[in-house]
Amino acid sequence: MQVYTIKYALIKKKYGDIDIVIGGPPCQGFSNANRQKNTAISQNNMLVRQYIRAILELDPKAFVMENVSMLKSEVHRFYLTREDVQIVEDYNIPVKETSLCLLESNFAFDGVLNIIQSYDQIVKYLWDEKHYSELNVVYKASKNLQKLPDVLKKHKKNLLEFAKAHINDSDDVILKADSEAFTAIMAYFSNECNIATIKDSIAEAIMYQRMLSKTKEIFDNDIVVERYETESGINAIIKSYAVYDYLKSILESEKHGYIIS
């Protein structure tokens, strides 16, 4: 059962008043990313929301939450969504502007802002997850030329199969980068490309896919973007608030009356 689907009202109906709730998000998962996918939204931080939901809906006399000290780190923040706006106002949760880097300046191009502000455009250019995962493994391995041949050999079958979907003669910046990346992969397997050139050949496509993935997350999670800045790459300026402040502001509010120590 997913924690998001638990109906705590049914638990209260079955067991009556709850004395204490014990739990907490997993400490080993507390990093801001699934770095394979370079995600913007930490699912482990999101588990904190679910734990607080459990407390509010079960209304226990007391609760024990593990790893609270880790939540005080600036690393653990929620991005403000449209759904959050009223909650932040009601509980006076402190927010600040946060810059989310979508694309480094050396990969920026004319028209990129129009793409990242259009969900249809994002979906149009975004690869199948399996395609990204395969090429991203190669990109990471390309930093070590001694290991790269083994990685390419291991993933050869999938890479050659996926290449069929990406090789094209388009002048579109993103599609052209896609094509160049997989053309280089095919050239390597045909002994027409030096392995040392692989990294540069696929970097652009990988960076565009990471940008698209992050911007899709912004749409999917209904995150409020204050503005986009282009002085140093492409950055989404969004508001965020500390996970710990969220926890403390809600649970210690007059409405709920808990004391966090």
Identify the residue ranges that each predicted region occupies.
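SAM cofactor-binding core of SAM-dependent methyltransferases
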Residues: 1-4
